[in-house]
């Protein structure tokens, strides 16, 4: 190894070690939908928060796969928390089989959309990381337009908990 190669290798190693790492979003969403229990690990690349510390918008995405690592069940859950009072919650659940969505359920805050409620048990902000935990409850129904209009004629109950530590969206 020449001096120049050695110096370059040392410089590259220094910069690799000196580059700050990004914290990973962690947590899970545990739901009971129509009497069936599900636990969804948070998808760290799709979960974050934005806004101010006293008025955050929180967006969580989570997925669970079957034992073969296929046919995911996907949850998207979001809400605002102005002065740490949850509002405007939205919950979406999609179950895939053989690459096709076989079940899609939606819920939101208004009574005609499932009366989804969020209760915050804890919250804290440390630099760009937000930690929250709480529970949700409501009804879920189907929709032909991705949750804009939710049909509750065959609604199913949903309840559960969430715990998450997520990074602020840049």
Provide a role label for each language-model segment.
Residues 1-9:
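Bacterial N-terminal signal peptides that target proteins for export
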Residues 6, 25, 124-128:
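Generic hydrophobic-segment detector
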Residues 8-10, 40, 49, 127, ...:
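A broad, structure-centric signal for solvent-exposed, well-ordered loop/edge residues
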Residues 9-18:
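Bacterial N-terminal signal peptides
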Residues 18-20, 131:
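A generic alpha-helix preference that emphasizes hydrophobic side chains
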Residues 23-113:
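An ectodomain-focused feature that recognizes extracytoplasmic/extracellular
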Residues 95-164:
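Acidic, glycine-rich flexible loop segments
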Residues 169-170:
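Short, solvent-exposed mixed-charge patches
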